[in-house]
Amino acid sequence: VCAYLQFDVPEGEKLTVRVASSFIGEEQAWLNFDREVKNKTVADLKIESAKLWNSMMGRIVAEGGNEEQMKTFYSCLYRVLLFPREFYEFDKSGKPVYYSPYDGKIHAGYMYTDNGFWDTFRAVHPLFTLVYPEVSERIMQALVNSYEESGFLPEWASPGHRGCMIGNNSLSLITDAWMKGIRSFDAKKALEAMVHQTQAQGREASVGRNGFEEYDKLGYVPYPDYVEATAKTLEYAYSDWCLSRFAASIGNVSIAEVYEKKSQNYKNLFDPSCGFMRAKNKDGEWIEPFRAIEWGGPFTEGSSWHYTWSVMHDIQGLAQLMGGHEQMGAKLDSMFNAPADYNVGTYGFVIHEIAEMVALDMGQYAHGNQPVQHAIYLYNYIGQPWKAQYHVREVLNRLYNSGPKGYCGDEDNGQTSAWYVCSAMGFYPVCPGQPEY
């Protein structure tokens, strides 16, 4: 739907145009008009908007630091709060209603859209549960609504299911909220949705679980049968851990045990001879040749340098695979000390994530994209917190600012901003799905 309006306005006069819209229909649009803009001036709306933003951003009172750091902090918090978008409206009685992008019908309740959980499960939603729990409550209800209307949980809503990125990170959102006391949604229906998400494939590769049959049979997703197979395996293992935690918390021991076992599948792709996560084919053979700096192929927007750390749910298990805390610490050190070399791999050209890693000049650490953003904090789990402190401060002070070039890469629905907000406050949700930062 589009419209073109032309006005004949005498020189020197001002024209005020008030517009309202609705995804539901004309009647709802007029309701929105009366509530939001009728008889209001631009100045009135500016004041209302300022009050609303202050009420949200004022929940965190930053102290210390200089003016530039304050500007950067609140600029990042502003970006965190831009997504996901509210896709619901209020009917005559003031109750929430929405047009569903999944079944095309009007429903009572809440709906959200424009959010890629592959990015935002890491820090955005854990920040919501802590500072904006009422937002998390509505998002959890919306996730269950999405499942009931489409048969799947969303992984990248835009406005409905979109074939983008990988993983079952909706399971992380639900588990993290539940474990932190946000329980105003149907837990049994949520568990049903979570299990189904791991045992079916939607029309888009990112909806459901791509390669779930092979994952269950082999203990990993084989490559090259499936693109991004190693990254998928690692993300599935984490999601299985989330599902196990959620099932156990509501008393479903049998499901919890099944998925706890699956959560250990990450071990199947660790090669002790080189200390990296690698790809295997369906016969269990390592894919050769292996180059830790090669992007794409079995990985998503990264290389083995970035995904080897994607075991947020079992850091001690990963350390054991590497030979212990000292060896894991040395491996982390080498990520920062290695040259920023790369092989474009299956991408065939230098994607912007590669260019950003090189420009950041932090070795193989690629803060400009999401998969490795938690890795700095792993030092805290192996008895070397001073190294985490050093690198966190380096990233805070060198890779962010309040200007137009204030980000070092993808900001992605607030995730890179949420990293700054959490880290500036002195904590980070390394493993969403447990009440720990």
Feature-to-residue mapping (PLM):
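Acidic/polar, glycine-enriched structural segments that form the non-catalytic walls/loops
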Residues: 1-111, 152-155, 184, 188, ...
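Glycine-rich phosphate/pyrophosphate-binding loops
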Residues: 133-151, 431-434
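Active-site core of glycosidic bond-cleaving carbohydrate-active enzymes
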Residues: 107-132, 171, 181-437
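A residue-level signal for conserved active-site and pocket-lining positions in enzyme catalytic cores
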Residues: 12, 76, 174, 315, ...
